A protein has these predicted regions:
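Enzymes that bind and transform nitrogen-containing heteroaromatic metabolites
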Residues: 1-188
Length: 188
């Protein structure tokens, strides 16, 4: 069965972006191999993102920046109750309930599914038990305040550490499996 994997970078104090969405603190020299991103791209064929992250991508493109092309272009699904009138090529908007969408996609043949973010959509998928793993790259920088990795909720989500890796620039990769409750495991 396909897995839904959050693959993301956070500041050392747990933020994925500044309050205004800026990720300037991510602009830094990267070690050879770009933290294993190439290998990760080979393992996925679908990207999920929330509306705010989609809007960030639109702004990125408007500024004349290009999205790196891959040998195989994954399909992008953005979640929003109010999709925009004009949608970037290669993106579809989803209004379907998350649980229903995830169940349908997990049943299809294919590679793993990349949950790009942001914090709101990650939290929504976690709330219904539909995140399998987190691969978090902790950048050795404090930004003080910003958008948290997961939007605040009153919940506890146990994780099982699968691996760690320290890179030459001080970045640490933490790979976790989300520990499913018995009820979540049965609902699949």
């Amino acid at each position: 069965m396909r897995k839904i994997i959050v693959y993301i970078a956070t500041s050392a104090d747990g933020y994925i972006a500044r309050k205004d969405g800026a990720v300037d603190w991510l602009d830094r020299p990267r070690p050879k191999g770009n933290y294993g991103m190439g290998e990760f791209w080979k393992s996925i064929d679908t990207i999920l993102l929330g509306r705010k992250t989609y809007d960030f991508v639109v702004q990125f493109v408007k500024e004349g920046k290009s999205i790196p092309k891959q040998k195989h272009e994954p399909k992008h699904y953005a979640f929003s109750r109010r999709p925009p009138k004009k949608v970037l090529p290669g993106f579809d908007f989803v209004k379907e309930p998350i649980k229903k969408f995830a169940k349908r996609f997990r049943a299809q043949k294919g590679k793993n599914i990349f949950m790009m973010g942001g914090g709101g959509i990650i939290a929504s998928f976690l709330d219904v038990g539909e995140i399998d793993e987190f691969i978090i790259h902790v950048i050795p920088t404090f930004i003080g305040e910003g958008i948290p990795l997961i939007a605040p909720r009153h919940r506890t989500v146990p994780l099982k550490l699968l691996s760690t890796k320290k890179f030459s620039d001080g970045v640490v990769r933490l790979h976790y499996e989300v520990v499913k409750t018995k009820a979540q495991a049965r609902s699949r």
